[in-house]
Curated annotation (Swiss-Prot):
L-serine binds at residues 246-248, 300, 402. The lineage of its organism: Bacteria, Pseudomonadati, Pseudomonadota, Alphaproteobacteria, Hyphomicrobiales. This is Serine--tRNA ligase. It comes from Bradyrhizobium diazoefficiens (strain JCM 10833 / BCRC 13528 / IAM 13628 / NBRC 14792 / USDA 110). Disulfide bonds: none annotated. ATP binds at residues 277-279, 367-370.
Length: 443
């Protein structure tokens, strides 16, 4: 969330940042609400101060036996007791209005972020590896999985509907191996601490990382059975729990409502979890295969750090995610996202796009990881702070990245390591996790 003081100090810069996001200027309307809020707070504080002073003056008047003065002051205090709740309510309402408006506005991109309105404005940063040459036409992962008999979308549809999959035997084992390999890499070589977090979280936790209020329709929600028949819609919204769309939500919020010792920073956390996304805006897109699922597995990387270190931490996080694909010997490219294509909470984002030879007409790059620095944007929403060099609390900076999406890594491995007979060669780095198995083939 944005700092209203920063907007007050430089409204032109704020509006310029919003323009790069494709948004209209908002500083004037925000500052008008802020002015009302400050005036209401001042009026409430002045009324409280006057009530305190008048109460003291009543005692002085009574000591001086000035009953008329005391009666006048008592009447004033009685009137203030009536008006003060109204003033406090007005101040609270203005504060809530400002918070509501600020909470729906995305983060401001760094100056170095390229301009652009969508993915067409993204800029290639660098490329790793090369496309492989096959002596046959590479197949899509779902064709490979169906032929093996280990990828069943029909069974999943019977259980849960569209955008789910049942993996079996060698492919189920391969997906598990990929996730374990990623976790081991990040914890043993990259210095991340493994966390096993809750998958169901409160509204305020979703708010903290920016899923609420703007992206409510993209989430899956769980409610207690006793609430199903409740006519109280507000109670439903208050008591519901959200299924995490990414472990970023749980991991980042571990710092919420805390003042950390900066000696503890950077705090680097990782988790392998199922993730759940309603994909409300994805109707008709990627309907085939495992590319876009309602439920998928992902290894998440989160860093909590100081303002001075956050930019360097982004480069480090990107490198950690890249090493997953390098060790799997997968061809990929890194893209710097343009301002119009970045996520809501991000100041700068790198996307890693892995080459999938079975996709499209002759193969295509598909996103497998996003690494973002968010500055203090999420920290303000969570009230996550650290004690700085001067001993005063200040907001931490947060970063998050996929390290990486396990399902998409499975797809990339299947399509990259497919053999002409439809079997899948197991990358050497994964073979220890597969009991030494070198090839996945049909029983």
């Amino acid at each position: 969330m944005h700092d209203i003081k920063s907007i007050r100090d430089n409204p032109q810069a704020f509006d310029a940042g919003l323009a790069r996001r494709g948004l209209k200027p908002l500083s004037a309307s925000l500052l008008a609400i802020d002015e009302r809020r400050r005036a209401a707070i001042l009026a409430s504080e002045q009324a409280q101060a006057r009530r305190n002073a008048a109460s003291k003056e009543i005692g002085d008047a009574k000591k001086a036996k000035d009953e008329a003065r005391a009666a006048t002051l008592m009447a004033e205090v009685a009137e203030l007791k009536t008006t003060m709740p109204q003033l406090e309510a007005a101040a609270k309402a203005a504060d809530e209005e400002l918070t509501k408006e600020l909470s729906a506005i995305p983060n401001i991109p760094f100056d170095e972020v390229p301009d652009g309105v969508d993915e067409h404005g993204n800029v290639q940063h660098h490329v790793f590896g090369n496309k492989r040459n096959y002596g046959f036409a590479p197949k899509l992962h779902d064709d490979l999985g169906n032929a093996l008999g280990y990828m069943d979308f029909e069974a999943a549809a019977k259980l849960s509907g569209a955008r789910f999959v049942v993996l079996k035997k060698g492919l189920a084992r391969l997906e598990r191996a990929i996730g374990q390999f990623m976790l081991d890499l990040h914890t043993t070589e990259h210095g991340y601490t493994e966390i096993n977090p809750p998958l169901l979280v409160r509204n305020e936790v979703m708010f903290g990382t920016g899923q609420l209020p703007k992206f409510e329709d993209d989430q899956f929600w769980a409610i207690k059975g006793e609430l199903l028949a409740s006519p109280d819609h507000e109670r439903l919204k208050t008591e519901r729990l959200g299924l995490i769309p990414t472990a970023e939500v749980s991991l980042t919020n571990l710092a919420r409502e805390s003042i950390l010792d900066e000696k503890q920073l950077p705090m680097r956390l990782t988790a392998l979890t199922p993730c759940f996304r309603a994909e409300a805006g994805a109707a008709g897109r990627d309907t085939r295969g495992m590319i876009r699922q309602h439920q998928f597995t992902k290894v998440e990387l989160v860093s909590i750090t100081t303002p001075e270190a956050s930019k360097d931490e982004l480069e480090r996080m990107l490198s950690c995610a890249e090493q997953v694909l390098q060790k799997l010997d997968l061809h990929y490219r890194v893209m710097t996202l343009c301002a119009g294509d970045m996520g809501f909470s991000s100041q700068k984002t790198y996307d890693i796009e892995v080459w999938m030879p079975g996709q499209g007409d002759g193969g295509m790059f598909r996103e497998i990881s996003s690494c973002s620095v968010c500055g203090d944007f999420q920290a303000r929403r969570m009230d996550a702070r650290s004690r700085g060099p001067d001993g005063k609390p200040r907001f931490v900076h947060t970063l998050n990245g996929s390290g990486t999406a396990v399902g998409r890594a499975l797809i990339a491995v299947m399509e990259t390591y497919q053999q002409e007979d439809g079997s899948i060669a197991v990358p050497s780095v994964l073979q220890p996790y597969m009991g030494g198995l070198k090839v996945i083939s049909r029983d």
